[in-house]
Amino acid sequence: MNKDQFRGSHLYSAIQLVMAIAIVAALCGCQSTYYSVWEQLGKHKRDLLRDYVQDASKEQQKAKVEFKDALTRLKEITGFDGGKLEEAYRAVEKDYERCSDRAASIRSRIKDIEDVSAALFKEWEKEITTYSSDTLRSSSKSKLRETRQRYDALHTALQKSSDSMTPILARLKDQALFLKHNLNAQAIGALKGEVVSIEGDIQKLIAEMNTSISRADEFINGLQ
């Protein structure tokens, strides 16, 4: 191993160690240590907030596709004309599970955003008091106020779309269970009215997600 390889391997090991400490700190609930470790890697709270918002936006993009797929599957089943009903039920069940997992992932991203934004704003408020320049202090206060306003709009949109998933998931689960216990043409026919109703809910959810994604883009651009 040459010197460059030796230095590279040790740098990689050091980064792995620091990241491991960050993960342990997060699991133990010690946020200050968690953020401190990330700062050692060159990622400050502002950078983490940007990353978390981007992650949430990507998760919502995926959720849009998965909820649309679930709706498409239900529509196909209501027009089911013979074939293997057991396979149809399994497909609906998997759609529900995918949507449920995605919703849980989005809720987790929102929690990350809430935690790091609270820490960032607290730190920002504290640092504002250390300015000796009235002009710079006033400018920083104004920037903080604008950032908070954009954050509030983003958080409201994120929470609204996340909350809208809950009743839709409950209805998807109901339909999967109904099919499980009633694998016959009569049961399929009984779902038609439900599918028409849930279609409107999913379209509304997708519109809310689009709004949330737009708010995320606006917020990220404002952090540049």
Where do the language-model regions lie?
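Long amphipathic all-alpha helical oligomerization modules
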Residues: Y34, Q159, T166-Q224
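Primarily heptad-repeat coiled-coil rod domains in cytosolic scaffolding/tethering proteins
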Residues: V37, H44, D51, F80, ...
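Immediate post-signal-peptide N-terminus of mature secreted/exported proteins
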Residues: Q31-C99
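Bacterial N-terminal signal peptides that target proteins for export
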Residues: N2-M19
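Extended amphipathic alpha-helical interaction segments
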Residues: R109-G189
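Long amphipathic alpha-helical segments with strong coiled-coil/leucine-zipper propensity
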Residues: K64, K75-S142
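Short amphipathic alpha-helical segments with heptad-repeat character
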Residues: R50-S57, Q61-K64, E93, E97-S100, ...
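C-terminal motif of bacterial Sec signal peptides marking the signal peptidase cleavage site
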Residues: A25-G29
